[in-house]
């Protein structure tokens, strides 16, 4: 099993960063490795989203169910993709009106060793920088307001 556990306190209000991360459809606009992203459904505080990744000439996609509590939490569970296991959660802790602690915990395992050998280095690289990518975009949005 592989794990990601990251957190950072940022000078962005909780609503801005939560909405950015919860809007799967917008990922393709600012995440360089995201070839496409879409929301299949959004109802009863559950989003079904699909992300297509393209990096180092390798393309793949996966779909997750994202159960959310507005401005608090997003819980991710794999629906389909090259993983035998993928689940995790984003947590948002409002520190004050302008500051938020954002945390990501993710655990994953690829379907088999061949897939793992080709995708793990790419996925690990993406996961190492994902929080920074969302924070950079949140600051861009904040500065435009």
Task: For each feature predicted by the language model, list its residue ranges.
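Hydrophobic pocket/interface hotspot
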Residues: 17-21, 27, 49, 66, ...
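Short, highly charged C-terminal tails/helix-capping segments
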Residues: 136-145
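Generic structural detector for well-ordered beta-strands
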Residues: 7-11, 38, 52, 65-67, ...
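Hydrophobic ligand-binding cavity/cleft-lining segments
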Residues: 1-44
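Short, surface-exposed coil-to-beta transition loops
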Residues: 3-5, 59-63, 85-89
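Beta-strand/loop substructures that line and gate deep hydrophobic ligand-binding cavities in soluble
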Residues: 78-129
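Glycine-rich portal/gate segments that line the openings of hydrophobic small-molecule binding cavities
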Residues: 38-79, 133, 137
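Short strand-connecting beta-turns/loops that link adjacent beta-strands
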Residues: 13, 42-44, 71, 95-99
């Amino acid at each position: 099993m592989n794990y990601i556990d990251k957190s950072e306190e940022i000078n962005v209000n909780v609503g801005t960063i939560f909405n950015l991360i919860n809007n799967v459809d917008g990922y393709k606009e600012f995440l360089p490795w995201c070839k496409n992203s879409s929301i299949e459904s959004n109802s009863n505080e559950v989003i079904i989203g699909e992300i297509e990744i393209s990096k180092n000439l390798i393309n793949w996609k996966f779909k997750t169910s994202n159960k959310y509590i507005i401005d608090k939490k997003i819980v991710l569970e794999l629906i389909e993709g090259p993983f035998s296991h993928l689940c995790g959660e984003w947590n948002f802790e409002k520190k004050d009106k302008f500051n938020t602690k954002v945390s990501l915990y993710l655990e994953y395992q690829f379907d088999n060793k061949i897939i793992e050998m080709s995708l793990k280095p790419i996925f690990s690289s993406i996961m190492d920088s994902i929080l920074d990518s969302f924070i950079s975009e949140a600051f861009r949005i904040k500065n435009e307001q």
